[in-house]
C-alpha cells in the first residue's frame, strides 16, 4: 500500500490580516524543515508537500490539508482575524489540524493573566510538536531545532511574484527577496513592561550566522540572491559576545542591519561603549542605525551615548 502523501498548509496570519513587509521567520524555518525532509514546495497530489496559504481559501479547499501551521506576530491580528484563521479555529474538524503560535497570541497578557506560562509554551511548541517529531533534523535526530534550522527563503516566492504586479514600488517586497534573516542572540535585561522580553534577564546566544546565512547564487547575474542580512535580535549589544559576533558579520562583507534597533544606552553604560560605537560606525551597515528611546527618564544616558556616537 502506497504511503500517504501528507499536505501541509502554512498560514502567515498577519499577512492575511493587514499585510506585512517582512516574511515570517518561524514559517520560513518550518518550511525549511519540510524541504529538508523531501517535501515539495507548492501543492501537488503526487508527493508530500507544503505551501503558503496566501488568499481567503474557501472551506472546501482547506479540507485538502492534513496539518496547518499558523504563525501570528501581532496582537491586532487576533483582535480582527482574517477569514481563513476564523474558519480554521471555528470548524471542529479543521481546528484539530491546527498548530498555532507566535507572540500575537499572548503578548498583551499580564503576568497575572498567565503571560509567563504562555510564552514558555509558545517558545517550545514547535520542538514538542508530535508530527514534526516524526521527521528528521539535520543532526540526525527527530524534531525541528528552531535555532539551527535553515529557512526556506523561497516560501513566499509565488505570493511576491503576484503582488509585485499590484504594488507600485519594486522595493516593497525586497525584504522577502534580498535578505538572510535570523537571530544571533535572544533576550534582554531591561525588562520593559510593554515588551515580550519583560521577564527575561539577559541576552543569550541563539543561532549561528551559518544557520541562516543564504549563499544562493542568481544564475542570471552570477551574484548572491540575498546580498543583505537583517537581524531580529532583541538587544544585541547586551550580549557578552557582541564583539566576536559583530566581527563575524563584518567578515561576510555583506551589508547588515539590526531591525529591532540597538540599545544606545549601552554606549554610555558599557565599559567598552566607545569600542562598540567605533566598530559599528566602521561596519558595512545597511540603512539607518535604529536606536531605542523608550523611557524619558533615560534622557541623560541617551545624550551621553549620542556624544560618544558622534
Question: What is the predicted role of each segment?
Answer:
Residues 1-4, 59-66, 92-93, 175, ...:
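Flexible, charged surface loops at secondary-structure boundaries
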Residues 14-16, 48-49, 73-77, 104-107, ...:
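Short, solvent-exposed loop/turn segments at secondary-structure junctions
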Residues 92-184, 193-196:
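Catalytic core of nucleotide-activated saccharide and alditol-phosphate transferases
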Residues 10, 213-310:
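Conserved SAM/AdoMet-binding glycine-rich loop
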Residues 21-26, 36-37, 174-219:
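Canonical Radical SAM [4Fe-4S] cluster-binding loop centered on the CxxxCxxC motif
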Residues 1-117:
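A short, structured N-terminal alpha-helical element that caps or precedes a catalytic domain
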Residues 4-9, 41, 65-70, 96-99, ...:
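Hydrophobic beta-strand segments of well-ordered beta-sheets in folded domains
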Amino acid at each position: 500500500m502506497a504511503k500517504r502523501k501528507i499536505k501541509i498548509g502554512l498560514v502567515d496570519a498577519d499577512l492575511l490580516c493587514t499585510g506585512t513587509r517582512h516574511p515570517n521567520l518561524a514559517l520560513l524555518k518550518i518550511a525549511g524543515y519540510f524541504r529538508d525532509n523531501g517535501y515539495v514546495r507548492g501543492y501537488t497530489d503526487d508527493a508530500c508537500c507544503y505551501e503558503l496559504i496566501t488568499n481567503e481559501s474557501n472551506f472546501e479547499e482547506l479540507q485538502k490539508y492534513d496539518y496547518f501551521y499558523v504563525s501570528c506576530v501581532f496582537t491586532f491580528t487576533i483582535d480582527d482575524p482574517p477569514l481563513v484563521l476564523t474558519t480554521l479555529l471555528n470548524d471542529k474538524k479543521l481546528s484539530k489540524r491546527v498548530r498555532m503560535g507566535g507572540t500575537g497570541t499572548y503578548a498583551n497578557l499580564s503576568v497575572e493573566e498567565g503571560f509567563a506560562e504562555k510564552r514558555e509554551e509558545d517558545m517550545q511548541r514547535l520542538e514538542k510538536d508530535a508530527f514534526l517529531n516524526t521527521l528528521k533534523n539535520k543532526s540526525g535526530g527527530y524534531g525541528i531545532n528552531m535555532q539551527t534550522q535553515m529557512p526556506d527563503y523561497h516560501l513566499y516566492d509565488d505570493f511576491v511574484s503576484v503582488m509585485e504586479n499590484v504594488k507600485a514600488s519594486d522595493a516593497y517586497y525586497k525584504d522577502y527577496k534580498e535578505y538572510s534573516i535570523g537571530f544571533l542572540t535572544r533576550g534582554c535585561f531591561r525588562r520593559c513592561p510593554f515588551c515580550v522580553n519583560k521577564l527575561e534577564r539577559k541576552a543569550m546566544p541563539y543561532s549561528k550566522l551559518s544557520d541562516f546565512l543564504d549563499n544562493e547564487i542568481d544564475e542570471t547575474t552570477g551574484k548572491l540572491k540575498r546580498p543583505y542580512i537583517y537581524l531580529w535580535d532583541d538587544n544585541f549589544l547586551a550580549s557578552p559576545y557582541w564583539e566576536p559576533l559583530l566581527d563575524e558579520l563584518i567578515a561576510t562583507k555583506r551589508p547588515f542591519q539590526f531591525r529591532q534597533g540597538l540599545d544606545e544606552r549601552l554606549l554610555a553604560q558599557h565599559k567598552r561603549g566607545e569600542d562598540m560605537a567605533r566598530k559599528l560606525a566602521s561596519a558595512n551597515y545597511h540603512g539607518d542605525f535604529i536606536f531605542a528611546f523608550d523611557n524619558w527618564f533615560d534622557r541623560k544616558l541617551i545624550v551621553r551615548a549620542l556624544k560618544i556616537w558622534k
